[in-house]
Design a protein with these regions (language model features):
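Distinct, well-ordered alpha-helical segments
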Residues: 17, 44-46
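C-terminal domain-tail junction helix/linker
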Residues: 50, 74-136
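Short small-residue beta-strand/loop micro-motif enriched in glycine and branched aliphatics
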Residues: 1-2, 54-57, 81-82
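Short helix-loop-beta connector
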Residues: 25-28
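Two-metal-ion acidic nuclease core segments, chiefly of the RNase H-like superfamily
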Residues: 46-53
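A short, conserved beta-strand element enriched in hydrophobic/aromatic residues
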Residues: 1-20, 30-33
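RNase H-like two-metal-ion nuclease catalytic core shared by retroviral integrases
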Residues: 34-36, 42-43, 56-76, 89-97, ...
């Protein structure tokens, strides 16, 4: 799940967590990893994530967040740098197009066995269901 905002507030983080839970039809994500930004150490964030396993990167150590840092570089390089972004609405549409119409659905990823994230996740679900059927 994702949320685009021009402010760094805990409400945006909580909105994204709720979107992820709804999309996956689960009550709690297994692990939430973040940096130590103020929105991730707030009392509200701690309350909402009390039943989740939270992981934090070391302060001023971006290598702990290499995956998301790489993603931010990728979305800029592959998509956003092609445009002169006019306003928030334009930025939102561009991010939506990249994530929902390309990155998650069509773009292959080496760490997903050269499948899109959506295809990889669907395969994972089918394997899990098959294993449950075979075990039971």
């Amino acid at each position: 799940a994702w949320t685009l905002s021009n402010i760094l507030e805990v409400s945006c983080v909580i909105e994204t967590i709720n979107k992820a839970k709804a999309r996956r039809k689960i009550e709690e994500p297994l692990i939430l990893h973040s940096d130590r930004g103020s929105q991730y150490v707030s009392n509200e964030y701690k309350r909402v994530t009390a039943n989740m396993q939270c992981s934090y990167s070391k302060k001023a150590y971006p290598w702990d967040n290499a995956c998301i840092e790489s993603f931010h570089s990728l979305i800029k390089r592959e998509w956003l740098n092609r445009f002169k972004i006019r306003d928030y609405g334009h930025a939102y549409r561009l991010v939506f197009e990249y994530l929902e119409a390309f990155y998650n659905t069509k773009r292959i990823h080496s760490h997903c066995d050269y499948m899109s994230p959506n295809d990889y996740e669907e395969l994972y679900r089918r394997v899990q269901q098959h294993e449950l059927l075979m075990a039971g």
